[in-house]
Amino acid sequence: LAHRLYPAVYKLMSMGRIAGESIEPEKFVSDTVARDDKRLVTLTYDDMGMPSLSVTPPYDEDDIKEVTADQQRATQDPVSAFLLPVRATDTPCARTIPIFDGKRRFNLTFAHQGTKKIAPHDTSAPDGWGPSLDTIVCTMHYEAITPPAKKRRFTTVLRRNDEMKIWFAPFNDGRVYLPVRFEIPTPLGAAVMELNDLTATKSASLGRDEKSALVVSAQESTRF
């Protein structure tokens, strides 16, 4: 059903560094096939956090001219935005993250709602369920910055919805939280995205800056 209503395939990849309680993205790639539209978007970040955009086929100039250089600087991509580093026992939820996806500039604000133990789906497990995870549940609010929100179906749902929830679980010895479940109410009922498989590797040192790297490969499923 979800595929019939939103016929699209998204392949997203993000590379970057964990620096304290933030992520410093280095590269983001989005390979999208939606209906008759195919597009490859790449964002490459310099040392000052300024992204350089490459798009094939190119966007129309009118689609991206409103997002200024100042608005793009020190933002995160749509994948690294959901990797939430923490110190000690701090909650990952109390933060607002500025995001630029190559076309739109928007904020995501997370707020702590509670804790919950969940068992995500695992297609490789005999019973179809993975091990239980202790998660922190956050609400999420979407705020369009530039360009002003347009009447696109998905962004309209995001803008009008203050009941979106994300379940974050601790990884990397509790120093970073990753989303394992995402729920958004829609006119057809709740759309649920769950983590099916996760492979993570880390590098203890990247040189003098003493920042650590986390490379994550994940598979998710969406259902209504």
In which residue ranges do the predicted regions lie?
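A charged, solvent-exposed segment within the mature domains of Sec-exported extracytoplasmic proteins
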Residues: 38-105
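Acidic, serine/threonine-rich low-complexity disordered tracts
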Residues: 1-46, 93-224
